[in-house]
């Protein structure tokens, strides 16, 4: 091979490598400033936006017409991600996704909501919006704009274009069953050639498979520079919801499921470092099964030490099971239409399915009754030093305040 050909070969390989680096970088950066600037690009102020209805079509501005066109045009090109081999994708309906979005009933959704339920949601959303606007409550990421959120931090926002819904899932807050509901609604997973109709029939391993859901972090690869604009179109039109839980009880639940049971992944990634750093164990078994047989388990105190250690997040962000809700769901950047709570799960689930107008189509799966109870807090924290409890509250204070959970005074004083 001549020197000229060799030079050209290296030039081509170098160019391909640089292009791959650019793609990887922008996928992480989130294309923060590469989108069309229309009416949806401007920040929204004032009262929450009303649910779009038939009368709103007459009020659309020229910019809104562009938004509507782009929404339909881009939605029409949506291709489902690859799913597990035994589960084939649902073929697009005639007319593609555009028909699904265009044919959706955008009429007001709260006709069957009782006055008490309406007041409760209004109070929860008012508390959330109030503290997002209140300068007295400060926490990381509070002041940043939606455009500044990296794509990697948008992976918890699941989109259902068929019913106009966006769900931000929070681990340890009934997210497995809500993911099942989203799979049924979106028809994103087939079993023997037909979409699942019963949420409980969906195998757990498919529920948590990222390829079973369309999430915001996938938009950049599909739509490039238009991804942020399309996200804003959907955030304005769709019903956005999340479910939360008392932050300390959520931590206890995460500890119970990940460290009190044999979990090989969490043992290797988290338990081994915790046991070495906070329990002074230098020689540890290779597997969780061996460790459990030898009586080597992470204590709740070790777990709290790990959370409070300033070096923990210098190595990597908190795992999603104990990461703060404000970091998972960005409630000060996204105006949620419905805030559900695990403490009122049954009532809230029924109300939300009515709001989405799918209550005749499916029921929310019955909840697991061996749930970590808030009454256990004092027992779990009894051996945790007061100073640690106070530091832990500061770490999760934003979640307590934003979602209306009372400060656990009994745990924060002698």
Curated annotation (Swiss-Prot):
Glycans are attached at residues 134, 209, 280, 370. Its main location: Golgi. 3'-phosphoadenylyl sulfate binds at residues 171-177, 245-253. Its EC number is 2.8.2.5. Residues 27-414 are lumenal. It holds the Pfam family Sulfotransfer_2. Residues 1-5 are cytoplasmic. Residues 80-125 are annotated as: Disordered. Residues 99-125 have a biased composition (Basic and acidic residues). Widely expressed. Expressed a high level in spinal chord, heart, spleen, thyroid, pituitary gland, adrenal gland, peripheral blood leukocytes, thymus, lung, small intestine, fetal kidney, fetal spleen and fetal lung. It is found in: Golgi apparatus membrane. One of its GO terms (cellular component) is Golgi membrane. Belongs to the sulfotransferase 2 family. Catalyzes the transfer of sulfate to position 4 of the N-acetylgalactosamine (GalNAc) residue of chondroitin and desulfated dermatan sulfate. Chondroitin sulfate constitutes the predominant proteoglycan present in cartilage and is distributed on the surfaces of many cells and extracellular matrices. Activity toward partially desulfated dermatan sulfate is however lower. Does not form 4, 6-di-O-sulfated GalNAc when chondroitin sulfate C is used as an acceptor. This is Carbohydrate sulfotransferase 12. It comes from Homo sapiens.
């Amino acid at each position: 091979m001549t020197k000229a050909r060799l030079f050209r070969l290296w030039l081509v390989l170098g160019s391909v490598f640089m292009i791959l680096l650019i793609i990887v970088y922008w996928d992480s950066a989130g294309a923060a400033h590469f989108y069309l600037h229309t009416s949806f690009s401007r920040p929204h102020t004032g009262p929450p936006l009303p649910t779009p209805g038939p009368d709103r079509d007459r009020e659309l501005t020229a910019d809104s017409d562009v938004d509507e066109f782009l929404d339909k045009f881009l939605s029409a090109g949506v291709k489902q991600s690859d799913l597990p081999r035994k589960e084939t994708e649902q073929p697009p309906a005639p007319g593609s996704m555009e028909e699904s979005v265009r044919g959706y009933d955008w009429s007001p959704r709260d006709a069957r909501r009782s006055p008490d339920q309406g007041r409760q949601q209004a109070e929860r959303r008012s508390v959330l919006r109030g503290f997002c606007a209140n300068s007295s409550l400060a926490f990381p990421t509070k002041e940043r704009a939606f455009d500044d959120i990296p794509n990697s931090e948008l992976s918890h926002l699941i989109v259902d274009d068929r019913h106009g819904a966006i769900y931000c899932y929070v681990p340890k807050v009934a997210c497995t069953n809500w993911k099942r509901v989203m799979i049924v609604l979106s028809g994103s997973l087939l079993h023997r050639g037909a979409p699942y109709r019963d949420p409980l029939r969906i195998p757990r391993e498919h529920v948590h498979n990222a390829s079973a859901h369309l999430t915001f972090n996938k938009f950049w690869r599909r739509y490039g520079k238009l991804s942020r604009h399309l996200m804003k179109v959907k955030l304005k039109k769709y019903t956005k919801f999340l479910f939360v839980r008392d932050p300390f009880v959520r931590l206890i639940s995460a500890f119970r499921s990940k460290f009190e049971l044999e979990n090989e992944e969490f043992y290797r990634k988290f338990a081994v470092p915790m046991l070495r750093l906070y329990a002074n164990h230098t020689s540890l078994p290779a597997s969780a099964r061996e460790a459990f047989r030898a009586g080597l388990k992470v204590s709740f105190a070790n777990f709290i030490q790990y959370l409070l250690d300033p070096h923990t997040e210098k190595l990597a962000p908190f795992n999603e099971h104990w990461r703060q809700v404000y970091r998972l769901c960005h409630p000060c950047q996204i105006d949620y239409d419905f805030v559900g709570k695990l403490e009122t799960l049954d009532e809230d689930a029924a109300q939300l399915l009515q709001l989405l107008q799918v209550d005749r189509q499916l029921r929310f799966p019955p909840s697991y009754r061996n749930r970590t109870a808030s009454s256990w807090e004092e027992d779990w924290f009894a051996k945790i030093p007061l100073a640690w409890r106070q530091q832990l509250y500061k770490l999760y204070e934003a979640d307590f305040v934003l979602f209306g959970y009372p400060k656990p005074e009994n745990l924060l004083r002698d």
